[in-house]
């Protein structure tokens, strides 16, 4: 599975895959796209490099050709990924460091957002914050969100077994205590809301930029509301002052 790391969603679901073909001799040709011409080059490089790794690992693929279209840094990114050069070499003189730290930051945010997705149903079902602080991952009802959280924690080397605490610090892996739990849950919620808002905005902008839905795109109704709000030119109603 190839993810748009900043949004923690598959690039297919986001609509970022413009086309994908595999020749009879095992050459996979994938064209990627982004919502704007000026999307951050570090994010774009991560996406293309991760796509190269994911496609190359598919059984039967002899060679992967991953191309980012319509981006101001397309040439540098495409040539760098094809040559297996890193970000610094691909942007010689412009980049100071590789993207490992950035990737880890994105995954930590995904852990926080995933924590909210797992904990909200538990709280809605009557669990208390004290309950959450004492729970393990294995005690959470099985769900796609739980396994997604487990996967992100594993990527960072954080505790992720059934016996691991449900709530851990996304940097240190230490269990979150009862006193720190309210703040931790607020941060998790804000991170999840921010990620979903960014995802909706990206989908809306991509839809405005390209007519086709993309290979494997999944429609998100939230993006419709966000896009309508951004494009709404109706002036806000004037404030009515009341006088005694």
Language model segments and positions:
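Domain-level signature for proteins that mediate thiol-based redox and metal-cofactor handling
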Residues: 1-37, 42-244
């Amino acid at each position: 599975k190839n993810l748009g790391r900043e949004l923690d969603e598959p690039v297919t679901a986001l609509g970022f895959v413009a086309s994908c073909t595999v020749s009879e001799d095992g050459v996979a040709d994938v064209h990627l796209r982004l919502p704007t011409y000026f999307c951050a080059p570090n994010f774009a490089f991560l996406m293309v490099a991760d796509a190269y790794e994911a496609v190359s690992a598919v059984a039967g693929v002899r060679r992967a050709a991953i191309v980012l279209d319509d981006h101001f840094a397309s040439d540098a990114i495409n040539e760098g990924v094809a040559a297996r050069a890193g970000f610094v070499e691909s942007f010689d003189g412009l980049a100071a460091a590789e993207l490992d730290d950035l990737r880890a930051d994105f995954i930590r945010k995904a852990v926080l957002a995933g924590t909210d997705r797992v904990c909200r149903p538990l709280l809605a079902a009557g669990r208390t914050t004290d309950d959450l602080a004492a729970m393990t991952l294995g005690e959470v009802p099985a769900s796609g969100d739980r396994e997604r959280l487990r996967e992100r924690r594993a990527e960072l080397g954080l505790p992720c077994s059934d016996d691991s605490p449900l709530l851990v610090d996304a940097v240190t892996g230490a269990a979150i205590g009862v006193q720190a739990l309210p703040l931790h849950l607020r941060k998790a919620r804000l991170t999840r809301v921010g990620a979903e808002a960014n995802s909706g905005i990206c989908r809306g902008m991509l839809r405005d930029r390209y007519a086709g839905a993309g290979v494997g795109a999944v429609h998100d109704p939230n993006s419709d509301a966000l896009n309508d709000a951004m494009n709404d030119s109706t002036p806000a109603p004037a404030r009515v002052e009341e006088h005694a």
